[in-house]
Amino acid sequence: MEAGLSGSPEFTDTVGVLTSWDQGVLLITKKDGQSVRISESSLVAGKIVPAAPARRRGPAASFEELSRVAARAWQPLESERLGDWTLRAAAGFTRRANSVLPLGDPGIPLDDALARVTSWYARRSLPAYVQVATGAAGTQEMLGAELERRGWASEVSAEVRIGSLAPVGDVDAPAADEVRLTRVPDEEWLGRYGRVSDPDLARRMLVEGPSVWFATLPGGRAIGRCVVDGRWAGFAAVTVDPAHRREGLATAVMAALARRALEEGASAAWLQVETDNPGASALYDGLRFARHHTYHHYRAAS
């Protein structure tokens, strides 16, 4: 509620997902991913808005839209703009949050831009990576070629896949009813995730995003993470105890997360899978995720 020109109350609406209500402040995540804070004292009324009917066909998306959605799902601790490039750092936790996202022109000659990049990461005692996408309209094949010509090496490649969310939520996965959903990763979740040298840093990084959910099966048999951002639900960190593989647990985790994302109004899904992970690729094939584009992390020459 705000004061109008005449001094009388003027009412405004905010539509989104209530992601927290703490110390008298409501945090609402809008469909575009923007977060809005509302003082409890200014709240006049609230109601549940039914989710739009879920789309059953595969979603359409541009490379830039997906790149920005993915970036919001793995947010850095610090970032700096260089023209249309974003330099990101997070103390080395994940390449995605510790690489340049080059969505356009850096605004200066490429050699000067790369010099700025390597210097920026060196000051943080981090290797310099540039995330380059290929295989879709608007991707960066030319930039990749220029980096290779300058001695940068592609170390890791991953597919970005997309699909309709509703079929993931509808999949027959009895263990989905056992999945525990939380807003923060607990010790059991982090223990199964395994890629953690600094638990405090991991927790700080993993909870960042528009609307983040963590899924855990009892005993840490399987885990997953999902970030709901407008129409998109992004799946990550789907990990299964090796002793319980081929039991449908990864599917169960994804089904439980998908159902929660559908409740929040999402209709489309995305995920990233490294190209040398045939087991995960087979899982996502079965859930009808299709490749949208591929990205590569190029590392600066030593």
Predicted ranges, named:
Residues 67-78, 86, 110-201, 213, ...:
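Acyl-donor-binding surface of acyltransferase catalytic domains
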